[in-house]
From Swiss-Prot:
Belongs to the SHOC2 family. This is Leucine-rich repeat protein soc-2 homolog. The keyword Repeat applies. The keyword Iron does not apply. PROSITE patterns: LRR. It comes from Drosophila grimshawi. PANTHER family: PTHR48051, RAS SUPPRESSOR PROTEIN 1.
Length: 622
């Protein structure tokens, strides 16, 4: 018996939108993209800072939309041909009330109480009818692109076999547990999107789809790669992210046309030598698995430009990695590496080097200097005790360096002398006691994070960093801030939390672009009156200090939204001028002995406190 019978509809270049009106063919599926980077591991469909993503080409126009936007849930009692409960309901809307049938009820065995059929079931019945109609139109009009995504489909009707002209079929975000054998009749299919379903296997008949190029199986329940996939030798893009796959068979070597393979977020412990046969791969994502080693054969994938290995359990990287001279991005974040191979020097196209979250103590001599295309270097959360060897040459084209959470006790003098484009430096959580004497030459620095070190002094030369917008010095041992801080006219964020500062310089008032000033947990007894010039300040935190009073000029902070002055045991009153801060949304005055303001007013929040200050102010114009 031939399962692939067809009505013989003439092929058409027309595709239908969700409204059923003819449209010209769209441009086809969007190109697959792949990125990963620093910051977070993890997870979700995008890496930044460093987590990886894969984006499948989903149809969004020029298609016949079958099931609308979904809705419904649970099992659909209607069969795939639209019968069962449908005959009781489908024409009720056109019947007069007196002749209209009663609502269908379902009596459960465990209960004698009749229960009305839920709206979900009715919606699912309608969804099934819509899908059947969409398949019929697809057959009759020779439609090539069909979008049945988000249609609450649990069973794909076997009439799909009649849609022989289909080249693109989108079934993502449904509830499909198994595909019908008839899917193999779609011999012209090139793109098949099955992501976000409940598939545990694929039918062997899929092998007849010999023109299939893009197969998306993300977010299903596959415990292994279905064997039929290895017979789809025309595949160029294969997404298997977020399944339950534990092994990769040697048959993978048959997919020689693959350019993109995503196995991200599975349970794979070993990647066999078969990976080396995929010489056309440009993107390989095996992040978020349980790999401890990579095969030497990975070096045969010489066309790789993106290799994402982050969030595994890698103990080493094979020397053959140096063969990947087209490599631009290499994700090694959060593994168990103690070192990286010298051969990485050969990967001269890499523009980002990120080994965050490993146990690396040093890099091969001069490795970073050899990677002259690097623009971003992230070595955070390792065991470095000093800067990598290689001198100033290793940072020539770099704009961002992150060495957070290591054991580095100094920044070498002149190390950034050739880093003319360096704008971001993160040295948080190290063991720095001082900054190098040439800190004043870092004139292009925009963001400088020196938090959680042991700095005792900020050099006067800080005044030369006039492009600085973010300066974070929290949790150090600073006793004072130099007057030259006033030269940093572009500063937007100044964080001095948890130091030993007693007095702020008057020049702080020159920072007219300042938006956040964080001074909590110091020994400050008073704020300079010049603070009133900070017209763009939205956040001011002076909690846990020794404030005796707030200057009247605080009333000039028209942009202020958040004010933290809690836990100042000597602060007994607030200036009436504070009532002029009309944009104040949050005011924390806990554990301040404000005897002049009644407790019930204090408990009422910022607006009530401001109202009280205004009412009791000697300035009637307020």
């Amino acid at each position: 018996m031939n399962l692939c019978s067809s009505s013989g509809a003439t092929a058409s270049n027309t595709s239908l939108s969700s409204t059923g009106h003819p449209e010209s063919n769209g441009s086809g599926p969007s190109e697959a993209t792949h990125c990963f980077g620093g910051g977070g591991g993890g997870g979700g469909n995008n890496a930044g800072g460093g987590s990886g993503t894969d984006t499948a080409p989903n149809s969004n126009k020029g298609t016949l939309n079958g099931g609308g936007s979904g809705g419904g849930g649970g099992a659909n009692p209607a069969s795939s041909n639209g019968h069962s409960l449908t005959h009781n309901n489908e024409n009720n809307g056109n019947m007069p009330p007196e002749t209209r049938p009663k609502m269908v009820t379902v009596k459960h065995p465990e209960s004698n109480k009749p229960k009305p059929t839920t709206k979900k079931i009715v919606k699912n019945i309608q969804a099934d009818q819509d899908v059947i109609k969409a398949l019929q139109r697809c057959r009759d009009e020779g439609i090539k692109r069909l979008d049945l995504s988000k249609s609450s489909i649990t069973v794909l009707p076997n009439t799909v076999r009649e849609c022989v002209h289909l080249t693109e079929l989108y079934l993502y975000s449904n509830k499909i547990g198994q595909l019908p054998t008839e899917i193999g009749c779609l011999v012209n299919l090139r793109n098949l999107a099955l992501n976000e379903n409940s598939l545990t296997s694929l039918p062997e008949s899929l092998k007849h789809c010999t023109q299939l190029k893009v197969l998306d199986l993300r977010h299903n329940k596959l415990a292994e790669i279905p064997s039929v996939i290895y017979r789809l030798r025309s595949l160029t893009t294969l997404y298997l992210r977020f399944n339950r796959i534990t092994t990769v068979a040697d048959d993978l070597r048959q997919l020689v046309n693959l350019t993109m393979l995503s196995l991200r977020e599975n349970k794979i412990k070993e990647l066999g030598s078969a990976i080396g046969a995929l010489v056309n791969l440009t993107t390989l994502d095996v992040s978020h698995n349980h790999l401890e080693h990579l095969p030497e054969d990975i070096g045969n994938c010489v066309n790789l430009s993106a290799l994402d290995l982050q969030h595994n359990e890698l103990l080493d990287i094979p020397d053959s990695i140096g063969n990947l001279k087209s490599l631009v991005r290499l994700g090694l974040r959060y593994n168990r590496l103690n070192c990286v191979p010298v051969s990485l020097k050969n990967c001269k196209s890499m523009d980002e080097f990120n080994v965050e979250g490993n146990g690396i103590t040093q890099l091969p001599d001069g490795m970073l200097a050899s990677l002259s295309a690097l623009t971003s270097i992230t070595l955070s959360r390792n065991q470095f005790t000093s800067y990598p060897t290689g001198g100033p040459a290793q940072f020539t084209n770099v704009y961002s360096i992150n060495l957070e959470h290591n054991r580095i006790d100094k920044i070498p003098y002149g190390i950034f002398s050739r880093a003319k484009g360096l704008t971001k430096l993160n040295m948080k959580e190290n063991m720095l006691t001082a900054l190098p004497l040439d800190v004043g030459t870092w004139v292009n620095m925009v963001e400088l994070n020196l938090a959680t070190n042991a700095l005792q002094k900020l050099p006067d030369d800080i005044m030369n960093l006039q492009n600085l917008e973010i300066l974070i010095l929290s949790n150090n041992m600073l006793k004072k801030i130099p007057n030259t801080i006033g030269n940093l006219r572009k500063l937007r964020i100044l964080d001095l939390e948890e130091n030993r500062i007693e007095v702020l310089p008057h020049e702080i008032g020159l920072l007219h672009e300042l938006q956040r000033l964080i001074l909590q947990t110091n020994q400050i007894t008073m704020l300079p009156r010049s603070v009133g010039h900070l017209s763009n300040l939205t956040h001011l935190s002076v909690s846990e200090n020794n404030l005796q009073f707030l200057p009247e000029e605080i009333g000039s902070l028209e942009s202020l939204e958040n004010l933290y002055i809690n836990q100042n045991p000597g602060l007994e009153k607030l200036p009436f001028e504070l009532a002029l801060c009309q944009n104040l949304k949050y005011l924390n005055i806990d554990k301040c002995p404000l005897g002049t303001i009644p407790p019930e007013i204090q408990a009422g929040g910022p607006s009530l406190v401001l109202q009280w200050l205004k009412m009791h102010s000697p300035y009637r114009q307020m």
